[in-house]
Amino acid sequence: MRFSTTLATAATALFFTASQVSAIGELAFNLGVKNNDGTCKSTSDYETELQALKSYTSTVKVYAASDCNTLQNLGPAAEAEGFTIFVGVWPTDDSHYAAEKAALQTYLPKIKESTVAGFLVGSEALYRNDLTASQLSDKINDVRSVVADISDSDGKSYSGKQVGTVDSWNVLVAGYNSAVIEASDFVMANAFSYWQGQTMQNASYSFFDDIMQALQVIQSTKGSTDITFWVGETGWPTDGTNFESSYPSVDNAKQFWKEGICSMRAWGVNVIVFEAFDEDWKPNTSGTSDVEKHWGVFTSSDNLKYSLDCDFS
């Protein structure tokens, strides 16, 4: 997408409001759930990864509660390391969704409610046409009802936790999905300049443009600027096949970190980066799929690829 001067002006105004409220946006990371050999991560594996991330964040996001026993194994690790989790709930298919709710009911009582940052029902479910806006709204309301009946290890209720969703910025700005925004306590927007084939010269502009379009629609739909908002996924791969004018490399990932992620946070917008660690277990198939292994800011062996410092002066 080309950068729009009109939208840039609107974005600046919206960002100014955000920056007044929250100063520097928070940083978090999406976290994979499998080891290099494809086995599911244990509590010990998660503890090791969270220790590597601790210098940069205290919040992670996962896509599902039951897959690979994620909540069962990550919950205790996060609690031990002082992290909070955005817990994903996969809303399709029916058997998977039932397993997700069962995982919440079984493992949320074993940790403190302060370990949970919020619940995200679906991840780009609208973008993939997995669910209609009405169907996803119903699932969001259902999960809200489920967690309201669960108490933590100290007997505190999860009823006050926010329940929302995360989806691609472009489907959030589509008017026919407003029911999902209305049903959600909070909404996250994903935006990848890489998958739009942007040059490095335009990547950060495209990122800002996309996110601010989404934020503007979310604020308008909710009728308030006093809402929780995060970039749910963004980043740049460090290896693999180029996509149009977007080239994966460590230098380009570092540049996008500085010009896109750091700048977005400087305007007071919270950002969850995709992703924390490379996922070597992911298979190569065809086209540009080989980049899927290389989105981590850390290698799969926990080595930092480039500086994550931001200059907020």
Curated annotation (Swiss-Prot):
Q: Which InterPro entries match?
A: Beta-glucan_modifiers, Glyco_hydro_17, Glycoside_hydrolase_SF
Q: Which residues does the entry assign to the active site, renumbered to this chain? A: E124 (proton donor), E233 (nucleophile)
UniProt keyword annotation of Signal present: yes
Q: Name one Pfam family in it.
A: Glyco_hydro_17
**Signal peptide interval:** 1-23
**Can you provide one Gene Ontology molecular function annotated for this UniProt record?**
chitin binding
Alphabetical UniProt keywords = Cell wall, Cell wall biogenesis/degradation, Chitin-binding, Glycoprotein, Glycosidase, Hydrolase, Secreted, Signal
GO BP annotations listed: carbohydrate metabolic process; cell wall organization; fungal-type cell wall organization
Top-rank EC class of the record's enzyme? hydrolase
Question: Which superkingdom is the protein from?
Answer: Eukaryota
Where in the cell does this protein reside? Secreted, Cell wall
Reaction catalysed by this enzyme: Successive hydrolysis of beta-D-glucose units from the non-reducing ends of (1->3)-beta-D-glucans, releasing alpha-glucose
Choose one Gene Ontology CC annotation of this protein and give it: extracellular region
Q: Which residues are glycosylated?
A: N202, N284
**EC number of the protein:** 3.2.1.58
Q: What does this protein do?
A: Glucanases possibly play a role in cell expansion during growth, in cell-cell fusion during mating, and in spore release during sporulation. This enzyme may be involved in beta-glucan degradation and also function biosynthetically as a transglycosylase.
Give the record's family classification: Belongs to the glycosyl hydrolase 17 family.
Q: Anything further noted? A: This protein strongly binds to glucan and chitin.
Q: What is this protein called?
A: Glucan 1,3-beta-glucosidase
